[in-house]
Amino acid sequence: MSTIYMSQLPATLPLMEGDQDQGLYPAFHRAKDPPILFPFMIDSAVEHQGQIYGDQGLRRQQVLGESNQQFNDHMMMGGSDVFLTPSPFRPTIQSIGSDMIQRSSYDPYDIESNNKQHANGSTSKWMSTPPMKMRIIRKGAATDPEGGAVRKPRRRAQAHQDESQQQLQQALGVVRVCSDCNTTKTPLWRSGPCGPKSLCNACGIRQRKARRAMAAAANGGAAVAPAKSVAAAPVNNKPAAKKEKRAADVDRSLPFKKRCKMVDHVAAAVAATKPTAAGEVVAAAPKDQDHVIVVGGENAAATSMPAQNPISKAAATAAAAAASPAFFHGLPRDEITDAAMLLMTLSCGLVHS
């Protein structure tokens, strides 16, 4: 058995002479048949030697021999024109060869060969660099090269500016020195008595505080005394105002019901009065009142004695009048009686009118 492709055979075959049998070559005379992608098997002349005879057998052997030789030549040369009529649907040897992926000869575990190749400098494009490994590095806290903490952006920029100025001054041969402490390093130069930027930061702050204290001491002698007198005046006036308020609010401190409550003054006077050595009767003040009333025995001369809080003269007079026996008998005994008396008075007025 020998393998051949239909496309390897010539498109036209020589015409057979005489009355040769054309049925032996049916595939060679079908021009409209589609090309066959896969080879088919043709029996060799050795197997059909008993059936083939004469010139027909010789010609058939010659055609098969030429086709096999042509196919072998193309396969040995590896040409791209194996198929005489290329088609986009049939692969070619060249396209298959270009699509093949060639494996790299680099072995990452073969350390000795890799070292030799790097030493010799003979590296191909397939093994130019070993595969890189991804590394995740955690960014630590940024620290100052000197060991301190990170400065703020503004301070960092200012320090950088000061360092650049110092480097420039050192390059020019000029070194700035504080006129007070003779230091050459400071975060900020301040103005002083010797001129601008003649003091370091600490000396400038110290001298500024001293100047302010001296100015306050010079200008504050005359201004401090009036300020003290003005400040002391309200302190003396405020307690007086508070006392006046308390004295005026003595009568208004109680609720309205307690201030207008009607009390049986006769029973209260009998229970509360007690004779004294001088023959006077002392009427005890109710709980709601802030004074004690002393009434004489015969002439009923009423006087007022302050108990705890001082009261005005009008309040004392009203209290003395209320403490008299006639006033006690004239008042009703309770609210119901008072209401009945008011109702009778109104009805009596309506009848007489």
From Swiss-Prot:
A motif (Nuclear localization signal 2) lies at residues 244-251. Pfam families: GATA. Residues 142-166 are annotated as: Disordered. A zinc finger (GATA-type) spans 178-203. One of its GO terms (biological process) is regulation of DNA-templated transcription. Keywords: Metal-binding, Nucleus, Transcription, Transcription regulation, Zinc, Zinc-finger. GO terms for molecular function: sequence-specific DNA binding; zinc ion binding. The keyword Nucleus applies. It is found in: Nucleus. A motif (Nuclear localization signal 1) lies at residues 137-144. The keyword Protein biosynthesis does not apply. Mostly expressed in leaves and stems, and, at low levels, in roots. Belongs to the type IV zinc-finger family. Class B subfamily. This is Protein CYTOKININ-RESPONSIVE GATA TRANSCRIPTION FACTOR 1.
